[in-house]
Amino acid sequence: MEQAPEDQGPQREPYNEWTLELLEELKSEAVRHFPRIWLHNLGQHIYETYGDTWAGVEAIIRILQQLLFIHFRIGCRHSRIGVTRQRRARNGASRS
C-alpha cells in the first residue's frame, strides 16, 4: 500500500511572520526610491480601505511590489535593472 512521503523539506516560517518580514523589506526599499509623503498617503489609503486586517497587509505588499517593479523597469538611477548598456569611449574621450 502506498503512503504519502514524510515532510522532509525545510521548516517553514508561519505565514504571518513571513508576510510581516516581507512588508518590512519592501517598505525599507520603497523609502529609498519614493517620497515619504507618497508612501504615507498610500498607507492611509490602504488603512481607510481595509482597516487593520491581513487583507490590507497583502494589498500594500502587492502595490509596493508593483510600484518597485515598474520603477526599476523604467530605469531607476539607483539600479541597473532596465537600463540599456551604453558603450563608453576609451582614453577619456567623450562627446558632450
Curated annotation (Swiss-Prot):
Q: What is the lineage of its organism?
A: Viruses, Riboviria, Pararnavirae, Artverviricota, Revtraviricetes
Q: Provide the positions where the record notes the PTM Phosphoserine.
A: S79, S94, S96
Description of how the protein assembles with itself and partners: Homooligomer, may form homodimer. Interacts with p6-gag region of the Pr55 Gag precursor protein through a (Leu-X-X)4 motif near the C-terminus of the P6gag protein. Interacts with host UNG. May interact with host RAD23A/HHR23A. Interacts with host VPRBP/DCAF1, leading to hijack the CUL4A-RBX1-DDB1-DCAF1/VPRBP complex, mediating ubiquitination of host proteins such as TERT and ZGPAT and arrest of the cell cycle in G2 phase.
Specify where it is mainly localized: virion
Instruction: Relate the protein's function as given in its record.
Output: During virus replication, may deplete host UNG protein, and incude G2-M cell cycle arrest. Acts by targeting specific host proteins for degradation by the 26S proteasome, through association with the cellular CUL4A-DDB1 E3 ligase complex by direct interaction with host VPRPB/DCAF-1. Cell cycle arrest reportedly occurs within hours of infection and is not blocked by antiviral agents, suggesting that it is initiated by the VPR carried into the virion. Additionally, VPR induces apoptosis in a cell cycle dependent manner suggesting that these two effects are mechanistically linked. During virus entry, plays a role in the transport of the viral pre-integration (PIC) complex to the host nucleus. This function is crucial for viral infection of non-dividing macrophages. May act directly at the nuclear pore complex, by binding nucleoporins phenylalanine-glycine (FG)-repeat regions.
Q: Which GO terms describe its cellular component?
A: host cell; host cell nucleus; host extracellular space; virion component
Please provide the Gene Ontology terms (biological process) for this protein. DNA-templated transcription; monoatomic ion transmembrane transport; protein homooligomerization; regulation of DNA-templated transcription; symbiont entry into host cell; symbiont-mediated activation of host apoptosis; symbiont-mediated arrest of host cell cycle during G2/M transition; viral penetration into host nucleus
This protein's name: Protein Vpr
Q: Which family does it belong to?
A: Belongs to the HIV-1 VPR protein family.
Location of the protein in the cell: Virion; Host nucleus; Host extracellular space
> Which keywords does this chain's UniProt record carry?
Activator, AIDS, Apoptosis, Cell cycle, Host G2/M cell cycle arrest by virus, Host nucleus, Host-virus interaction, Ion channel, Ion transport, Modulation of host cell cycle by virus, Phosphoprotein, Transcription, Transcription regulation, Transport, Viral penetration into host nucleus, Virion, Virus entry into host cell
Q: What else is known?
A: HIV-1 lineages are divided in three main groups, M (for Major), O (for Outlier), and N (for New, or Non-M, Non-O). The vast majority of strains found worldwide belong to the group M. Group O seems to be endemic to and largely confined to Cameroon and neighboring countries in West Central Africa, where these viruses represent a small minority of HIV-1 strains. The group N is represented by a limited number of isolates from Cameroonian persons. The group M is further subdivided in 9 clades or subtypes (A to D, F to H, J and K).
Reported modifications of this chain: Phosphorylated on several residues by host. These phosphorylations regulate VPR activity for the nuclear import of the HIV-1 pre-integration complex.
Q: Which Pfam families match?
A: VPR
Organism, as annotated: Human immunodeficiency virus type 1 group M subtype B (isolate NY5) (HIV-1)
Renumbered to this chain, region (Homooligomerization) spans 1-42
